[in-house]
Amino acid sequence: MAFSYTDSLSQAGLSENIITFDDVEPVLETRNLSVAYGNNTAISNVMFQVPKNSVVSLIGPSGCGKSTLLRCFNRMNDLIPSATVKGTVKFAGQDISGPDVDPTEIRFRIGMVFQRPNPFPKSIYENVAFGPRINGMTDDLDEIVESSLRRAAVWDEV
């Protein structure tokens, strides 16, 4: 029962006029979500719900599955050949893991902000080219990457 603290609040003498999310459809939800990389299970049978218009923080020690879970929300695990994803991830009631769902559209609609920049485990070139590439810009990638790095004032550093 998510976010139902009315009993403990009323016992503490606090207002019972609070919002509960028990009857609200989640905007983002996982059911029995399991992810493995090769033979290594990263997360197992995760049940997770995010109510509409909420902000969620995932906090935990290194290696506990936070990044793996996030990669399920934006379908980045699709790009990892050894990744096996089982279970359901729904956004606005729609299963986003099906082959008929465009991962680019999902990435436009689900935003993530990290405390520290977290480049993909690829070269600088591949990290910069990733955005244009998933948006169908395959021509002139070299020029796009160089221009982007120059505008960020790091071309001479890399």
Where are these regions (language model features)?
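Conserved beta-strand
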Residues: 30-33, 41-54, 87-89
